[in-house]
A protein has these predicted regions:
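N-terminal active-site beta-alpha-beta segment that forms phosphate/nucleotide-binding
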Residues: 1-103, 107
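Charged helix-capping and loop-helix junction motifs
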Residues: 55, 128-134
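Glycine-rich, N-terminal phosphate-binding loop of Rossmann-like dinucleotide-binding domains
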Residues: 42, 116, 179
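Surface-exposed, charge/polar-rich loops and edge strands
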Residues: 103, 107-112, 121-124, 135-222
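Short glycine-rich anion-binding loops that position phosphate/pyrophosphate groups of nucleotides
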Residues: 44-46, 117-121
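Residue-level signal for inorganic ion chemistry
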Residues: 6, 64, 113, 129, ...
Length: 222
């Protein structure tokens, strides 16, 4: 299964590559700096570490939201989440924790950044199979007049060569990591661009059979 392949790939990946994560955060910042209400996530060990991005956006007075588990009795539900504003200190589980709920008015989200295992050719998310984002986002966005920008992120890109997802699975506008940005263009399937800053930093060699377009970071997100 594609999901199992992605999980095995995660186990083999170098989870401590801080340089790549910082490059990805820098690229994400260029995209998100014009948005005001942004839903991010609390990164797990296998996910792209976006903590530097969260703090940088807060320094720019952006309203950052994080998922907040819904408590059912003595336990937390695995079926969905609500959102809460990012605030310091976050001490319950150590250095980085879920935010606490507040009466802060939930404004309409402008942008949502979603961690993924992989995606298929319809630009829909393949996650861990719990369906938390698929259940939660429609409820959060139900009363919004405008659909927010949805950005998929991961350390390494994995794309299935066929459609594996369902119509209710999340579809993104963009995919981003330290190396590339892919735009979901329904007319041309997708466009892909390579981050020149990454090439300069790592001296990487790419497969040009996929018609990569080389460009600098500021031009990458046009």
């Amino acid at each position: 299964m594609f999901r199992d392949f992605c999980k095995e790939r995660l186990k083999r990946a170098k989870a401590k590559n801080k340089v790549r994560d910082k490059l990805a955060c820098k690229l994400l910042f260029w995209k998100l700096k014009d948005y005001q209400n942004i839903l991010l996530y609390s990164p797990l060990g296998h996910e792209l570490d976006i903590r530097p991005l969260i703090f940088r956006l807060r320094q720019k007075n952006k309203r950052v939201w994080l998922p907040k588990s819904i408590k059912k009795g003595a336990n937390f539900s695995k079926e969905g989440f609500t959102i809460a504003p990012f605030r310091l200190p976050l001490k319950r589980l150590g250095w980085f924790d879920e935010p606490s709920l507040s009466r802060c008015y939930k404004r309409e989200l402008d942008c949502i950044v979603v961690p993924i295992l992989g995606m298929d050719t319809s630009f829909r998310r393949v996650g861990f199979g719990l369906g938390m984002y698929d259940r939660s986002l429609p409820k959060l966005l139900k009363k919004q007049l405008k659909r927010p920008l949805i950005v998929f992120v991961s350390r390494e890109l994995a794309i299935a060569n066929s459609i594996l997802t369902n119509a209710y699975d999340i579809e993104a506008n963009l995919y981003m990591n330290a190396r590339i940005v892919m735009k979901n263009d329904k007319r041309k399937h997708y466009e892909q661009r390579v981050n020149l800053h990454f090439i300069r930093s790592f001296g990487s060699v790419f497969d040009h059979r996929s018609s990569h377009v080389l460009c600098d970071e500021k031009d990458l997100l046009r």
